């Protein structure tokens, strides 16, 4: 149904994207917790 290369790229990018969003949110949380606005 889907090309193996395309499915491989999607399966490879999804965890990286989720991890990137998690790390970004964590860094923003730490930055907001340590610094005053």
From Swiss-Prot:
User: What is the first-listed, main subcellular location in coarse terms?
Assistant: plastid
Can you tell me which residues the record assigns to a coiled coil?
A: none
State what this protein does.
Answer: Component of the cytochrome b6-f complex, which mediates electron transfer between photosystem II (PSII) and photosystem I (PSI), cyclic electron flow around PSI, and state transitions. PetG is required for either the stability or assembly of the cytochrome b6-f complex.
This entry's Gene Ontology molecular function terms read: electron transporter, transferring electrons within cytochrome b6/f complex of photosystem II activity
Name assigned to this protein? Cytochrome b6-f complex subunit 5
How would you summarize the oligomeric state and partners of this protein?
A: The 4 large subunits of the cytochrome b6-f complex are cytochrome b6, subunit IV (17 kDa polypeptide, PetD), cytochrome f and the Rieske protein, while the 4 small subunits are PetG, PetL, PetM and PetN. The complex functions as a dimer.
Q: Which family does it belong to?
A: Belongs to the PetG family.
Pfam families, per the entry: PetG
Keyword Transferase: yes or no? no
- Name of encoding gene: petG
Annotated signal peptide: none
List the subcellular locations. Answer: Plastid, Chloroplast thylakoid membrane
Q: Which GO terms describe its biological process?
A: cytochrome complex assembly; photosynthesis
> Which keywords does this chain's UniProt record carry?
Chloroplast, Electron transport, Membrane, Photosynthesis, Plastid, Thylakoid, Transmembrane, Transmembrane helix, Transport
What membrane topology does the UniProt entry give?
Single-pass membrane protein
Cellular component (GO) terms are: chloroplast thylakoid membrane; cytochrome b6f complex
Domain of life of the organism encoding this protein:
Eukaryota
In its keyword annotation, does this UniProt entry include NADP? no
Bilayer-crossing regions: 5-25
């Amino acid at each position: 149904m889907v090309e193996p290369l395309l499915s491989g790229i999607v399966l490879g990018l999804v965890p990286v994207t989720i991890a990137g969003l998690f790390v970004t949110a964590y860094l923003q949380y730490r930055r907001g917790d340590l610094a005053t606005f």
